[in-house]
């Protein structure tokens, strides 16, 4: 009888332990194709390795939030950290600046990573 109580208790304690673990997200901003001014492309923000799962991700154009953005489903790795991909269509040019802004419990303020057209 004690064994039937100990196993579920161990599982519950393990789940609570996972919530206590915090890992900051790694943020990568890149385009699907090499940047070519005036040619349609996709801007991607890949956020990975974070825990817990609550996260806010915005793609920015000249510091303002881009409204038409899609994203993958929240997924997790073998180590129980999470990852997501946010993306939108865009047409690069010389004057506009693009970035990805991420808010997560591990950051005291949101972190913004700029798109480097040469990457």
Swiss-Prot record:
Domain of life per record: Eukaryota
Family: Belongs to the beta-2-microglobulin family.
A Pfam family hit: C1-set
Cystine residue pairs: 45-100
Subcellular location: Secreted
Physiological role: Component of the class I major histocompatibility complex (MHC). Involved in the presentation of peptide antigens to the immune system.
Record's signal peptide: 1-20
Complex and partners: Heterodimer of an alpha chain and a beta chain. Beta-2-microglobulin is the beta-chain of major histocompatibility complex class I molecules.
Protein known as: Beta-2-microglobulin
Domain Ig-like C1-type, residue spans: 25-114
Keyword field: Disulfide bond, Immunity, Immunoglobulin domain, MHC I, Secreted, Signal
SUPFAM superfamilies xrefs: Immunoglobulin
PANTHER family cross-referenced by the UniProt entry: BETA-2-MICROGLOBULIN, MHC CLASS II-RELATED
Organism: Saguinus niger
GO cellular component, one term: extracellular region
Any Gene Ontology biological process: antigen processing and presentation of peptide antigen via MHC class I
